[in-house]
Amino acid sequence: MELSYTTTMHYRDVVFYVTTDRNRAYFVCGGCVYSVGRPYASQPGEIAKFGLVVRGTGPDDRVVANYVRSELRQRGLQDVRPIGEDEVFLDSVCLLNPNVSSELDVINTNDVEVLDECLAEYCTSLRTSPGVLISGLRVRAQDRIIELFEHPTIVNVSSHFVYTPSPYVFALAQAHLPRLPSSLEALVSGLFDGIPAPRQPLDAHNPRTDVVITGRRAPRPIAGSGAGSGGAGAKRATVSEFVQVKHIDRVGPAGVSPAPPPNNTDSSSLVPGAQDSAPPGPTLRELWWVFYAADRALEEPRADSGLTREEVRAVRGFREQAWKLFGSAGAPRAFIGAALGLSPLQKLAVYYYIIHRERRLSPFPALVRLVGRYTQRHGLYVPRPDDPVLADAINGLFRDALAAGTTAEQLLMFDLLPPKDVPVGSDVQADSTALLRFIESQRLAVPGGVISPEHVAYLGAFLSVLYAGRGRMSAATHTARLTGVTSLVLAVGDVDRLSAFDRGAAGAASRTRAAGYLDVLLTVRLARSQHGQSV
């Protein structure tokens, strides 16, 4: 299920996602989404709630919902009245965590941490160690979409084991609320005073907001008086502005594909022979030749002997590029791939391989030819490719690039970020600016936003840690602490689970994105070094 928005704004420490007509704003709370409509003529706007509810262990029981209600009562949370008579929304489950006193404590969070062993067992059908994280949604910044999951993601906090949700416990639901929970009411007071109201046409019809249904089932409407309404109250009929729209995947040829087709050249296998009959493109065997012999072929004192003038110029050019980007073995330069235990020329080879594999222009074929000439001329024996070594090198650089781009995408979700003095070097600042501009230019379906100095500084903070070789998660944690955007840690955690060899459209899209990010960083670094601006 998807909810679309056009822009974001910070108001009272809450991230609000504002719709195109500026008459509705969403915010995230404990894995659920609350929707607040603009008030009209002293009448409050429609309030709605979307998200997963917990139900029971079978199709007709409500054991889990009743358990949560019972625990809430035992903990003295009588003012919390879950919506509906049968289901309990995920943000009410948050309140069973001893570290959470009200919905206010889980504002801006996409997930719920469950420490209750009994409840965790209900959700996973397995005895678990204490602490599972249940994710109910994600915000897709590149599409400006809030995606609510039909089935949650459940991960053990300690072991990172991913569980399969129990089949009957969770369901996606939609509810109309008479009011917000008392702890959240103050957060939206005066919200629309800072959002200009659109001019209504004379023949304006009742407004509608589309809810795109992407799963097999539409969210179940729940009628009730809950959300802390202060009493049972009489039930009454309401007319919602939300209209459910079923998404149907395109069948047959299309002018625009949602994702590039998978590149089978290297993603299907790490066995080099499997790519021999593939369409023209770099193979892992070619990468291994360069990986194994490039340092000798390009760095030896007599590496130029027997080469043509053009080849000698190419050898010197590759040596210079490797030094400008990655430094030397004894004095590495702060740049992407710093955590990889590779020589500068090996990093350069992997860098160009990833770019060239996505059919982008790169000098990788020339590098292969030069190394091939050297091995033939000197009779150098090249052993069979070491698949794990190649996979680690490719995935390391692939994930670094994807983490940098994903962080930029997450930061661009926010039109306003907290102003802080974040010192970054000129090289990193240039990389950050170029990457943000590239990502903003790819978002063709949405209005272009303004890249602020804060965007540049905070992405620069991420890149600085990454370039120092301290790891992607360290960089994400550091940036999350600076910005308060905790979703950075989860997003980079998702990147760490991706592979440059994943199959399908999603894998192909990730490889295309990573190659694009690497291409941008390469271009800006070499351009700055050519003009003597690198420090």
From Swiss-Prot:
Disulfide bonds: none annotated. It is found in: Virion tegument; Host cytoplasm; Host nucleus. One of its GO terms (cellular component) is host cell cytoplasm. Pfam families: Herpes_UL21. It comes from the Viruses. Keywords: Host cytoplasm, Host nucleus, Virion, Virion tegument. Residues 251-279 are annotated as: Disordered. InterPro entries: Herpes_UL21 (IPR004936). May participate in DNA packaging/capsid maturation events. Promotes efficient incorporation of tegument proteins UL46, UL49, and US3 into virions. May also play a role in capsid transport to the trans-Golgi network (TGN). Interacts (via C-terminus) with UL16. Belongs to the alphaherpesvirinae UL21 protein family. This is Tegument protein UL21. It comes from Human herpesvirus 1 (strain HFEM) (HHV-1).
